[in-house]
């Protein structure tokens, strides 16, 4: 599973859901799908896919200012 994060600060692409905090992190099944999404938005310079390893999830949680345990995930497309 892959998330897409901003290269500048590691903050992930999230889906805003009313009443849910933190916002769910959007995920893609493959790196190719994540890269295709980035390219479709013309955001290759700003975004990058990351495999959701334990280390990556720790970094994403830190960027979001929350505990890893409180993170939720939403597959793309939802």
PLM regions with names:
Residues 1-78:
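Conserved NAD+-utilizing ADP-ribose enzyme module
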């Amino acid at each position: 599973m892959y998330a897409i994060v901003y290269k500048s600060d590691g903050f992930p692409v999230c889906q805003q859901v009313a009443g849910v905090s933190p916002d769910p992190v959007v995920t893609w099944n493959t790196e190719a799908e994540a890269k295709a999404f980035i390219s479709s938005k013309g955001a290759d310079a700003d975004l990058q896919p990351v495999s959701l390893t334990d280390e990556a999830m720790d970094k994403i949680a830190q960027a979001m200012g929350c505990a890893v345990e409180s993170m939720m995930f939403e597959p793309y497309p939802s």
